[in-house]
Amino acid sequence: MSNHKEFSEALKVIPGGVDSPVRAFKNVGSEPFMVQKGKGAYIYDIEGNKYLDFVQSWGPLIFGHADKDIQDAVIKTAKSGLSFGASSPLETKLAKLILSKFDWLDKIRFVSSGTEATMSAIRLARGFSGKDKIIKFEGCYHGHSDSLLVKAGSGATTFGSSSSAGVPEDTAKNTYLAIYNDIDSVKNIVEKEDIGTIIIEPIAGNMGLVPADKEFLIKLRKICDEKKIVLILDEVMSGFRAGELGSYGIYGIKGDIVTFGKVIGGGMNVAAFAGKKEIMDMISPLGPVYQAGTLSGNPVSMAAGIASLTKIFASRNLYTKLENLANMFMIGLKNIAKNHGIAIQVAVRGSMFGYFFTDKAVKNYNDALSADTKMFAKFHSGMIKEGIFLAPSQFETGFICDAMSEKEINFALKKANKVFDEISKDSAKKANKTKICSKKTVKKSVKNKK
């Protein structure tokens, strides 16, 4: 069956044909391919086409597709049962592995998705602080729970309004919007409102890759300390991706609560939130903050997470290799674009990378919105045709995996050069056509005057 036909069938029974909106490729104006399998750095569609994959399931697959060690752990555990609805030693083992890297985090609880992790972290922070009002930052995505699906109101100091149908305005009104990398926007809100919680992606990966400035995070931490505000660092994406210590290894900033996901599950549905003992002990059954989940901590997912982190901790120079490849890709892409007269900004944090077609530095959501999305769509479509799978949205992040080498990066850059060549030629043709049409219009106008 063809990609088109299979997607057409999906459209009949699944809203939009997908189970997560970005997979529909609407942001780049094309139709998605349907995946048959993945192996290492590559995925294959149902037509047999092969793609070098820089999406890597949106981050979890740091060792690439179908990693043998992780697969073996999953298969072995699955033979004993998929889920028990009771605790197993695997939960404790994975908890200890994660906490061993963060000496200020005392306890952790597992859930099944990043949305659950941030939603639970917000509830926990509110329960601990006794305050309902929170601050989030424009462009930071923390899952699709109601209180976090907000957009800016009439200004940075106003409360948010819902950005999705079905979210009550009263729910959104307890969420205030600040500007990423702008500490004054935070101060303006904190001075006027009784804020109990601030949540942030220290390395924003959902408006494209936009890292926080270190000085901004230092000042944010200081405000939280002075005002006794609970600071949640959302590291669902950046945890064990930007480095073994996530954002902490880069900035040295400690969150009161930290959320994890993606890599800690090795490709299975695992996320978590962790914090200091006095905060975490507020969760039931110890405290009054309720949180539960049927499949939370299921043994198969725990086994995948243990295998993933064990392999990470045993891999010497893993993150150095991944960051070198990410820099090689982004620096190369920037140089190629420059040679074609195309404005581009690039960013790298560990194995994460992003690019914007703009000549302006991207520091926040408004900067990201000003980038040339039409150029992005052209580039993405061209790369797909050349067998390179990049995130099908300007507002997503790309990922390097351990199965890649300089060979794959050079291949991707070679294809990028070809795509930019075609874009430049197409632009030149259109410009020439416009010029000819303009001359004809002028001649016709002169003739009519005579």
From Swiss-Prot:
It comes from the Bacteria. Gene3D superfamilies: Aspartate Aminotransferase, domain 1, Type I PLP-dependent aspartate aminotransferase-like (Major domain). It holds the Pfam family Aminotran_3. It is found in: Cytoplasm. One of its GO terms (cellular component) is cytoplasm. NCBIfam families: hemL, PRK00062.1. Homodimer. This is Glutamate-1-semialdehyde 2,1-aminomutase. It comes from Campylobacter hominis (strain ATCC BAA-381 / DSM 21671 / CCUG 45161 / LMG 19568 / NCTC 13146 / CH001A).
